[in-house]
Amino acid sequence: MTSSTRTASPVSTDFDFLVGEWDVTNRRRTDFLDEASEWEEFPAVSHGTRHFDGGANFDEIEFPTKGFAGLTLRLFDRETRLWALHWADRRTGRLFPPVVGGFEDGRGEFYGDDTHEGKPVRVRFIWSGITADSAHWEQAFSVDDGGTWVTNWHMDLTRR
């Protein structure tokens, strides 16, 4: 199924699992576009909240060993039934272009366009392995409009 046909559930409870406090184990590539680059691991702590009767979700994440923090604002479009995920971080002070998509069979896929080090990239976020006490997120970039993907960041979340 393509990102254009993927839809969110009829009720906007998709991101309710993120509400609360989480310990996060990060694993990301040292070069986001090179699938042969080394992985680095580091911790984070995240706090998620629900807003607009489930139509919005917000989380703040602190990366204590990296010296930065970020936030994600997720907004549910009741007309299109899709989520738009907006990321910002303290390093840049900039709101990155959103990734858009939804959940199907417990897996969320979200796509968007951005640049990385001056190169245009297609961006994919995947949420999977969602339980009451854990979840997995991953990010991938494509430089060939989705023909191939380099998964460059994993987060494993464990509820505090």
Where are the regions that the model predicts?
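Hydrophobic small-molecule pocket/channel-lining residues, especially in calycin-type beta-barrels
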Residues: 1-160
